[in-house]
């Protein structure tokens, strides 16, 4: 007869992850609902649709060692700029981001490896901004605020080739074995210029406050994202 011994530390980690996911889902739902209700009830809201370049930096720190991974792609989405008072506005929105990275190595011309990482995010920013008229039809803005980010998917595809024979392996980075949280609360800001209420040029940066490493040990994992568009 055998008895299965449960790992109490692993159970505790999974329980903490479940609690974290539950709380973040509630916060995400609340911010999304509040943003859409606010945008829909304010008559003076100015809608805008944007697309641009995105660069994400994922930093994992363990002790004194820090490893960084850069992914590039694009973002697309929309927001409502709602006037609160005077030059002060708030702009809730919803955006989708696609980020990718590809690395290839060859060993002695005999073994080739290729690693592709792809991530998909849904983000709900609530940015407060102050506008300043620079000239007729041109408005400069400085903005800052929180963004709630949710990882829709994150996959790593590994392809190895030896003497002409190849094999592909696809990894779900959100699998429990990889201790990678989907949710993040980011804080950031940037500057923008509006041209005749038709075109906006924007440069912004957001930094993730949540440690996305969900396992045990003295390890932290944070993500930052640069948006230009």
Feature-to-residue mapping (PLM):
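Sec/Tat signal peptide C-region and signal peptidase I cleavage site
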Residues: 22-23, 41-45
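Repeated loop/turn-to-beta-strand initiation elements of outer-membrane beta-barrel proteins
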Residues: 47-49, 87-90, 197-203
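Short glycine/proline- and aromatic-enriched beta-strand/turn motifs that initiate or cap beta-hairpins
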Residues: 43-80, 131, 136-139, 144, ...
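Outer-membrane beta-barrel "beta-signal"
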Residues: 48-50, 193, 222-229
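Extracellular/periplasm-exposed beta-strand and loop segments of Gram-negative cell-envelope proteins
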Residues: 57-70, 99-121, 151-184, 211-221
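Outer-membrane beta-barrel channels and translocator barrels
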Residues: 39, 83-85, 133-137, 196-198
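Transmembrane beta-barrel domains of outer membrane proteins
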Residues: 79-81, 127-131, 190-194, 202
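Hydrophobic, lipid-facing positions within transmembrane beta-strands of outer-membrane proteins
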Residues: 72-78, 122-126, 185-189, 197, ...
